Amino acid sequence: MKKLARAIVKMRRLILIAAVLLLIPAAVGAIATPINYDILSYLPQELDSRVGQLLLETDFHLASTNMITVEGMPTNELLAMKAEIDEVPDVLNTFWLSDVLDPAVPTEMLPADVQQFMFGKNDSTILIVQLGGSSVSEETMQAVAQIKKILRKNCFFGGISVILSDTKELVMGEMPWYVLCAVGGCLLVLFLSLESWLTPFLFMLGLLFPLVYNFGTNIFLGQVCFITVSLAAVLQLGVTMDFSIFLLHRYDEEKKLCASNEEAMENAICKTMSSITASSLTTIAGFLALCAMQLTLGADLGIVMAKGVALGVICTIVILPSLILFFDQWVEKYRHRTFMPKLTHLSHFVSKHPMPVVVVFVLLMIPFGLAQSKTDIYYNIFAALPQDMPGIVGTNKLGEDFGMMTNHFILVREELTASQVSTLCDEIKEVDGITQVVSLDSITGPGFETELLPDELMNIVQNGGCKLILANGRYKSGSDALNAQVDELVRLVKEADPEGLVTGEGAMVKDLVEIADEDFKNVNIWSIAAVLVIIALSFRSLSVPVLLVASIEAAIAINMGIPYFIDDSLPFIASIVIGTIQLGATVDYSILMTTRYREERLALRSPKAAAQQALEHCSQSILTSGLTFFAATFGVAAISKVELLESICMLISRGALISMVVILLVLPAGLMLLDGLICRTTYHWLNAPNAAKE
């Protein structure tokens, strides 16, 4: 390790040049990495809803089908607009009644199902826009943007592709502000806690390298979710800032003992490497636990963040020393006193009253622990988006004018007779909440020769060996009523055709609900188990990992219980990921406190004195880390219009503060009270035989 440290210091200029040059391919990779805005695409591919969605995309080209509600528009103007939309690249077809019948034919002559489907309230009709790509492809995004420009007044464009296009536009516009808020918040905390006005900027420069490298290497993942992209920089900034602080503090200590800055840095690298490597393992393990999710969004976020932490460690050890040595004289020139308190009075209070502190905390935990399970969770992804987005407005308009809050796409084998399909459609119409049912047979009627229908229509309703039935419902996706509706549809379809499939937003969100409940349990189990094992190996203890993880889990329970008391609801993904993020990111505080407590006990101090000293000396580091993590995420929560991101960041920022308070108040008291148990269940906890017992 000493040889490696010496090589890093000796070749610091070469390392800095190489690091800067590596930013170029990393930046190219970051720009070239596709971003996925469709959370439902992360569902397991073997689910019926996903299999059906793939068939809609490959055989029917309906996966990215969107609908335009047109109110009060003359037929000739509507046909002219339809023709313009047909000319847009990637638009396969814009379907309206004129594709089947002469527009002069009175609507009263149409079958009742067709009338109900094509004409709604407010003198409205509907255009079905069929796009060639998937709902998240770049071609689809461009086509949606062009169609928006063509639409006249009183036209409302709705559908998943439109909403995803709006989401992309919103997130890409806000993302630079996320980073600026995170950087600004971190700088403010660092100005207060560090001893030089230049050091915060130096840290930000040092963190630029792992951030860009992390985003650049995402290209090897194929694509990343917009949630990951939005959170990764902010989380990486908040989580890995500690490593830079540890290195600088150790370097300042070594400078007082060594003959040269180079020697001081070599010693600092050696001592920092072991401490931050062990510390980062718990954080990496916490993020990798997200890979246990069936919803592969977890693996997406977990891998990117674990990779970011690992790169943060490497860059702290290899690149940051070069920057510190290069700017050392300016750092010294602009020194100032730190404004972060040591919490001396608090340390004496906690060490004098450990039992009351723990009792009060346990009593406080009871209501929050009960409230945690009662916090309202919602699964309607679009409810987490601004409701004034054009795609949301257009989709809601379908519900207002046509009763289409949710579309169900039902696929059955083409071998089913017209009579069987008709019977199935009649049964579907009786399902609670279903407003319209349209199939080939409801359009043509019995005995009609399908060869007379245009290819454009036939390709929509029958293709790839399957017939398509479209059922519209008035319930919103993710609701209990909608989930019950999907169950009933699946039952009816399977009775008519054991190979039949029900897909669409409603079916996929129902699968999401079921998977999310399982993912929540799996992620918590894996993250807790991984962190327990790492801490147990680090301390060679059975009791210490339980105490440390219990402290953070208690903080998580309080964090998750607060929404119940403030009458707030959480998006499902926030409830899944917050536990592992808060555990992985803040368990380091407890490790730092426990390590210092052990050092004080080894120095022959009593448990009371050791707890007091540990709290006093660790308070500044924990305050700096906790407030930095809070500042990095709170800014995003304050400005984001995407409720999904706002909720996650608010939980993380609040969790950082709660974990910080628990570690500063409760953990030292717990270490004091359980000192005897820790000594008996930890291998060589106290090597010094004369360590005080009282």
Task: Enumerate the language-model features and the residues they cover.
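Structured non-transmembrane domains adjacent to transmembrane bundles in polytopic membrane proteins
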Residues: 45-161, 376-544, 550-569
